[in-house]
UniProtKB/Swiss-Prot annotation:
Record-linked InterPro entries: Aa-tRNA-synt_II, aa-tRNA-synth_II, aa-tRNA-synth_II/BPL/LPL, Lys-tRNA-ligase_II, Lys-tRNA-ligase_II_N, Lys-tRNA-synth_II_C, NA-bd_OB-fold, NA-bd_OB_tRNA
Binding residue positions for Mg(2+) 2: E407
Family: Belongs to the class-II aminoacyl-tRNA synthetase family.
Cofactor: Mg(2+)
GO biological process: one example: lysyl-tRNA aminoacylation
Source species taxonomy: Bacteria, Bacillati, Mycoplasmatota, Mycoplasmoidales, Metamycoplasmataceae
Quaternary assembly: Homodimer.
Name this polypeptide is given: Lysine--tRNA ligase
Subcellular location(s) per record: Cytoplasm
Keywords of the record: Aminoacyl-tRNA synthetase, ATP-binding, Cytoplasm, Ligase, Magnesium, Metal-binding, Nucleotide-binding, Protein biosynthesis
Binding site for Mg(2+) 1: E400, E407
Annotated cofactor note: Binds 3 Mg(2+) ions per subunit.
Gene: lysS
GO cellular component, one term: cytosol
Annotated catalysed reactions: tRNA(Lys) + L-lysine + ATP = L-lysyl-tRNA(Lys) + AMP + diphosphate
Length: 491
């Protein structure tokens, strides 16, 4: 059991004040007033003259955190605004005990009448005051905030209190998710919820988190994708579905990866890959428009990105061959192995030709894709859920969207042939036995669903955290996840 570290003077003073308050009946009371909407109050009255308030009594009530005090002026943070309250010396003296035990960071409730100061600042003259919550720690400096990044992520609640940019980021994240819902809802998509715990691993290539289901005496996986249950709904006749939710992949974390992340997957019956690429492109344009961002000259990661022009589209093997100056189409597996060794590409025991083509793409092409670019035609070995290309069965009707050298979306013309799907799953089992820890298992229930007939469809997955990084211009995923996973803190 961890023993609490010794209190510093400030913490001890605050605890002593709390003891005094408790002795005199303080018990962290509930709020007593109906609170006003301060945003509306500010919009309605901020431009009124001093004389207006002399002629009209406007009474308001609200609660918030005391963040600064100068004499009779108290700055209260409430509803994402800083409101100035005037509390006269006479009122403070009348309530001397409470004010003697008040500290910055305490949560207070006030009511009174609006007025304008000599400098024209909208303020409230307080005639009712109560202490709701006693803060036992001083807040970080309002100007400097929390300088240690690790501490900022561990104590995000403090970061949000003192860092307006952090607070702005997460309000914008909420708006982005709301806009995504609006985009799909307006097109007749149905939002659904599917299980987080899966008895069979599938839907993506990733290492899973494993848990144990006591009542079933069976291991389950935290989902690595929502793809398979959503495609079952296509079988069920739900022609347009999407899900926004948490995904879990038991892998490392860096500036663009977190093991627990949020994604949207959407599926549309009777849509092909071209339609899904257009839909994805339209979603980005919709978000830029609604967020009032400049699509033609968007600054991100010290680069100018153009979202206004139609997104580029390249065939994977063609652009990789071009940038490598090496003909991947005519090369056999032995040629690719030799080339991989020369280029320092690690070769796994389960690799086939398609795996190596993908590795070459990641090394030579991916970092060069700055403007929005769809890469089309992935090898069948790395795309077990996508339809094969009828003109070249070794490749698939699959695309990924890259921006600034990073993947932002992954989409397929969805495989709906149950015989082919079972064969793909069986190939994944062979890979797993050869050491591929990210290979899928055979999901017989999904195959059976396909046997009843799934309409031709297109689908896409987009990481919302990475999308939020882009739209808020943050270069670390930890800046857009409220409580990112961190290494255990050393005592």
């Amino acid at each position: 059991m961890k023993i609490m570290s010794k209190l510093n003077d400030q913490q001890q003073f605050r605890r002593d004040k709390l003891k005094n308050l408790v002795k005199n009946g303080f018990n962290f009371p509930s709020s007593t007033f109906e609170h006003d909407n301060l945003v509306e109050i500010n919009e309605k009255f901020s431009q009124k003259s001093k004389e207006f308030f002399l002629e009209n009594q406007v009474k308001i009530a609200f609660a918030g955190r005391l963040i600064r005090q100068r004499g009779p002026f108290f700055i209260i943070f409430s509803q994402n605004l800083q409101i100035q309250a005037y509390i006269s010396k006479k009122f403070q003296k009348k309530n001397e005990f409470i004010f003697a035990n008040l500290d910055l960071g305490d949560i207070i409730e006030v009511s009174g009448y609006l007025f304008k100061t000599q400098t024209g600042q909208l303020s409230i003259k307080v005639n009712n005051f109560s202490l709701l919550t006693k803060s036992l720690h001083p807040l970080p400096d309002q100007y400097y905030g929390i300088e240690n990044p690790d501490e900022k992520y561990r104590k995000r609640y403090l970061d949000l209190l003192v860092n307006s940019e952090s607070a702005k980021t997460f309000r914008l994240r909420s708006k982005i998710i709301s806009l995504i819902r609006t985009f799909f809802d307006s097109q007749g998509f149905l939002e659904v919820d599917t299980p987080v715990l899966h008895p069979v691993l599938g839907g993506a290539s990733a290492k899973p988190f494993i848990t144990y289901y006591n009542s079933l005496s069976q291991n389950f996986y935290l989902r690595i994708a929502t793809e398979l249950p959503l495609k079952k709904l296509l079988v069920a006749g739900f022609d347009r579905v999407y899900e926004i939710g948490k995904i879990f992949r038991n892998e490392g974390f860096d500036s663009t990866h977190n093991p627990e992340f949020t994604s949207i997957e959407f599926y549309q019956a009777y849509a092909n890959l071209e339609k899904i690429m257009d839909q994805t492109e339209n979603l980005f344009r919709f978000l830029f428009e609604k967020l009032n961002l400049d699509p033609a000259n968007f600054d991100f990661s010290n680069k100018k990105i153009n979202f206004l022009e139609k997104f580029a589209r390249y065939d994977m093997i063609e652009i990789t061959s071009k940038l490598m100056n090496f003909d991947l189409k005519s090369a056999n597996f032995a040629d690719l192995v030799e080339k991989a060794k020369k280029e320092g590409v690690k070769i796994e025991p389960f690799f086939k030709k398609g795996h190596l083509i993908n590795k070459f793409f990641e090394k030579f092409v991916e970092p060069t894709l700055i403007n929005p670019t769809f890469i089309i035609g992935h090898p069948i070995e790395i795309s077990p859920l996508a339809k094969s290309n009828p003109n070249n069965p070794n490749f698939t009707l699959r695309a990924e969207l890259f921006i600034c050298g990073k993947e932002f979306a992954n989409m397929f013309d969805e495989l709906n042939d149950p015989i082919d799907q079972l064969s793909r799953f069986q190939a994944q089992i062979i890979e797993k036995n050869q050491g591929n820890q990210e290979a899928s298992e055979i999901d017989n229930e999904f195959v059976q669903a396909l046997e009843y007939g799934m309409p031709p469809a297109g689908g896409c997955g987009i990481g919302i955290d990475r999308l939020t990084m882009l739209l808020t211009k943050n270069e670390s995923i930890r800046e857009v996840i409220l409580f990112p996973q961190l290494k255990p803190k050393k005592d």
